[in-house]
């Protein structure tokens, strides 16, 4: 008797198929591991896709040196627990020049410490395919991007020159120096992600759960003061509020939301009534009109 697949089972099957397609078609793939909820789901799917073997590719974390401390601790804990090969890359030039979100702004910081750093890492190791956790429901430029997203030798994405994808048939051909960014979660929504995390009991960074945290209200956002590098502006005070994060990145550029959702069930319930994008908590999306597409054209995730 054939039992119809559930919605989550269909999404899972599609993602696993994509992982296996890349492993078969490319010489040196890598998974970009940002440590957030989407990366956690991606890691879980990669483990399933190749079980009982380990995924046949390393996990790459581009460290800006401004991630939440809990994210870094969770990253190292998961690498040890799951036994995957973890590569951590810094833009050493940016570290030397002390590029940071406070003195240089979110645009310069993101370009130097994320985009340029990612291009450096891909060139250094010679990866020809890179898995990412982007979803089409997150943001308009991601909504029009293919699952297999072609990049030229300079890692540039041209949204007007994308390859057709019909009936799950993917064009994996590339010339020397070119690469593909692959997004197995393209057709998932934020709610799908949380329901799958709940169903599969996937470990996630504790920052996603509501807790009393020291935050500063700045530029219309609640910023967690994660260390002493964040100096208070005149008139600012640190308050303890019950908050959690819908999205994670560099702590000075990521806003918390007031919430009492401290369990997976409560988060799923909150998502069922959410009417705003999780990206509203990312300061980098406010740099300028179409800023995400501009970043992606330059080689961003």
UniProtKB/Swiss-Prot annotation:
Keyword set, alphabetical order: ATP-binding, Nodulation, Nucleotide-binding, Nucleotidyltransferase, Transferase
InterPro entries xref list: PAPS_reduct_dom, Rossmann-like_a/b/a_fold, SO4_adenylTrfase_ssu, Sulfate_adenylyltrnsfr_sub2
Enzyme Commission identifier(s): 2.7.7.4
GO molecular function, one term: ATP binding
Reaction(s) catalysed (UniProt annotation): sulfate + ATP + H(+) = adenosine 5'-phosphosulfate + diphosphate
Keyword Metal-binding in record: no
Domain of life of the source: Bacteria
CDD domains membership: Sulfate_adenylyltransferase_2
Pfam family membership, one: PAPS_reduct
GO biological process, one term: hydrogen sulfide biosynthetic process
Coiled coil (UniProt feature): none
Record's keyword annotation contains Cytoplasm: no
Region Disordered, annotated ranges: 279-301
Subunit structure, interactors included: Sulfate-activating enzymes, NodP and NodQ, may be physically associated.
Function: Proposed to provide activated sulfate for transfer to nod factor.
Family according to the record: Belongs to the PAPS reductase family. CysD subfamily.
Protein's UniProt name: Sulfate adenylyltransferase subunit 2
Organism: Rhizobium sp. (strain N33)
The encoding gene: nodP
